[in-house]
Amino acid sequence: MSETTAAKIPVTVLTGYLGAGKTTLLNRILSENHGKKYAVIVNEFGEIGIDNDLIVESDEEIYEMNNGCVCCTVRGDLIRVVEGLMRRPGRFDGIIVETTGLADPVPVAQTFFMDDDVRAKTELDAVIALVDAKHLPLRLKDSREAEDQIAFADVVLINKTDLVTPEELAIVEDVVRAINPTARIYNTSRSGIDLARVLDQGAFNLERALENDPHFLDHDHEDHVCGPDCGHDHSHDHHGHDHHAHDHDHHDHGHDHKHHDHGHHAHHDAMSPIHDITVKSVSLRGGEMNPDRFFPWIQKITQAEGPNILRLKGIIAFKGDEERYVIQGVHMIVEGDHQRPWKDGEKRESRLVFIGRELDFDKIQKSFMACQAEVAVA
């Protein structure tokens, strides 16, 4: 994370189930006069349904658009396509990768922080998931991938809100929040949203996300924002659910977070899609950590649980360290760095969020707490 990112091109990974509205959003990116030059990478040009009227020039896999953006296809090697874009004259304001045919966004995201050459020139900016508000309950019953896409996302666009009632939308919002407690959520119809609100946000970079929102990991920040085409009244204030009911002000750090499935079963009837969710979030909060215990622990747990960990992110306070340590990971890949000095009066505590499947909360919590500096070694 300590690498300079000033000259790097931000990369947005766009995911979402068939019919969620990705094509509509991509056509907007490739046609609107937004003054930016984006490169859009799709799996198959014909499949994604880009409007042919937008094309002014085509050169093998690269398609020039009327507004200066380009669209290119990837057949196999994503890295080769990205490197080809980097060699083109001029500079792109951003790269958007659409995951058609690649239901799992994780391998695409990993490309941008595993390959040294690509990483030197680009930076993963955000993973954006589009959700079909009308059909999400059915999608969750049919597809594990639909749930993974939400769980892995930094930003979720709940689209087609004009096709559901306010009550149905409230349930969809609860489901999305239960799957991914830290994602920023926007409600839209016809994928209508100011592109500046979802592109070049630095959402995947935990350091920048924390700079933009110091309470990013607190799970209670209000972030339901309507797109310009969303006409719903969202004054329901999370529908009466207290998403901060996890009571993170305990000082014994031994509280049971098993209710991080958010207890929504009590809020909706037996048909609620919440019952179909298999992804859970595990939130840990402790005191100052001993680095000699913490680093071997995080390495061990990610090696053991890696396939089940979709995302992990956190802020760690190390005893005797005057700077906050920010850590994030995907599956078995974890990276971290110091972010900034602790402020006067700021509570020096450690917070860590795991999002994944079949995670043993009690085991993770117990071993995490054993990394605290004041805990005696047995």
State what each model feature region is.
Residues 354:
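Flexible loop/N-cap segments at domain edges
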Residues 2-3, 164-343, 347, 357-378:
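C-terminal accessory "lid"/substrate-recognition subdomains
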Residues 2-140:
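Nucleotide-state-sensitive switch-loop elements of NTP-binding domains
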Residues 88-197, 202, 206, 210-213:
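Phosphate/Mg2+-binding loops and adjacent switch elements
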Residues 33, 90, 150-151, 319, ...:
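Flexible, charged surface loops at secondary-structure boundaries
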